[in-house]
Amino acid sequence: MAQLKQILQEMGSVIIAFSGGVDSAFLFKVASDVLGAAALGVTARSPAVPRNDLRDVEAFVKQFALNHEFIETQEVKSRQYRCNPTDRCYFCKEELFSRLHQLRKERGIAHLVDGSNAEDVGDYRPGARAARRQGVRSPLQEAGLTKDDIRALSRELGLPTWNKPAAACLASRFPYGTPISAEKLRKIDRCEDRLRQLGVRQVRLRHHDTIARIELLPEDFEIVLRHRDEITDFLKKEGYTYITLDLQGFRSGSLNLSLIHISEPTRPY
């Protein structure tokens, strides 16, 4: 923690790309403690961001009276993003970081930072390339903090995010190569929101054309089975023909499994 505070102190002023997740929430709170109003958290609003995540962001900011703003991002207007290639995240993060970089210059803020931690090297992360391109710094990574470290320190600080489940944008519900649209993203958001209303804690509704594949924690299977007819009716009204429950349960990044032996594509960025 001391090293992180020193890094932030030396930065002087920062914009934090704040998603509301464990890492960026911890970074935002510590940066605010160290820098006061010179720490500005900024959250993107777009069809790809779950409404549930935005509600969590608003609650966190209100609880700790933090300096925060929302911005609208337009990644869904990008043809490259909508085509949903394996490096889709690059185009999303490029849009986000370029807008934050412009805001940073307009406000005279010294640095743009994100919540990447010391372990963020395992999954497929083309978005990290966009961060490097835009000169984004990662104080948690620089301080050598792991996810477990961040959860433990968040708990010590009394942050409600200390045990928050992993989250991902709604575009991650589509297999690579399946075209994405704003309406498809909103449909996934509505479906997942409905499942959460029934008491499901962690959910991914994977979109396979006319098939909805629901990933849940195994201990929540019973909830879905109990409300089977209600869920089936709702999802069919949303356009799905077949409603399935994945017996392997919730797996973060499950649609990346086909990429395990694929190296990142090289692009002249």
Which sequence ranges carry the predicted segments?
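Short amphipathic alpha-helix segments
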Residues: 182-201
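Internal, active-site/partner-interface "lid" segment
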Residues: 164-182
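Short, structured loop/turn "capping" segments at alpha-beta junctions
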Residues: 146-152, 159-168, 201-203
